[in-house]
């Protein structure tokens, strides 16, 4: 399903380079990191605009649980929430000269918070349906797990949102933590019709 950019009316011009992210995305992924058992999950990401010079972002990840033998006979409760985060995507008002951006790229910032006690600022580049981010700052509550650095990659591939998240945490070097493949919810609705 081809993606049509939203009507720019009401969308701040500052966020035009991020417009392809807008909408609700749903799909699956996997988490695997030293000390964390490999697990499959489902995810919903919602990226929206209220007209300001930013896009709001929420993500909910639920672990996939094997259905019980009686699943066909009764309604199963939703899978447990494993992780949530929320934040904002922004394009800085001035183009940084020290980020190594190409002419086709725009600077981008992602500010995220999660209930496990972390707030992070990621900085990077957006261009040609790809976003590369590295952590600029990660702050944690005293009770939050030790995460010292992170990298994120988002890409629009054949109309799907692919992402990967690497972290350095618990004394381990930077390595793959989680990844996902999501489809635009509107495209899922069209396919089901």
What residue spans do the PLM features occupy?
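Feature targets compositionally biased, intrinsically disordered low-complexity regions
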Residues: 26-28, 99, 123, 149, ...
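Amphipathic/hydrophobic helical signal segments and adjacent flexible N-terminal regions
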Residues: 1-54, 58-81, 158, 170-193
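Conserved hydrophobic/aromatic positions in well-ordered beta-strands
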Residues: 87-90, 152, 180-183
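Central antiparallel beta-sheet cores of small beta-barrel/beta-sandwich binding domains
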Residues: 35-142
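Acidic/His-leaning functional-site neighborhoods
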Residues: 115-169, 188-192
């Amino acid at each position: 399903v081809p993606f049509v950019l939203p009507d720019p009316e009401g969308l701040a011009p500052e966020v035009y380079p991020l417009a392809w992210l807008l909408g609700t995305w749903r799909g699956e992924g996997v988490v695997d990191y030293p000390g964390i058992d490999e697990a499959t999950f489902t995810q919903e990401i919602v990226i929206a605009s209220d007209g300001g010079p930013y896009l709001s972002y929420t993500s909910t990840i639920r672990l996939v649980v094997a259905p019980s033998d009686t699943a066909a006979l009764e309604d199963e409760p939703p899978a447990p929430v494993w992780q949530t985060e929320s934040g904002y995507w922004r394009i800085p008002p001035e183009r940084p000269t020290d980020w190594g951006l190409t002419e086709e790229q725009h600077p981008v910032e992602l500010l995220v918070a999660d209930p496990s006690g972390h707030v992070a600022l990621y900085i990077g580049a957006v261009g040609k349906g790809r976003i590369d981010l590295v952590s600029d700052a990660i702050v944690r509550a005293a009770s939050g797990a030790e995460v010292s650095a992170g990298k994120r990659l988002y890409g629009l591939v054949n109309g799907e949102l692919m992402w990967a998240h690497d972290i350095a945490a618990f004394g381990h070097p930077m390595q793959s933590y989680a990844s996902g493949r999501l489809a635009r919810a509107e495209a899922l609705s069209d396919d089901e019709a």
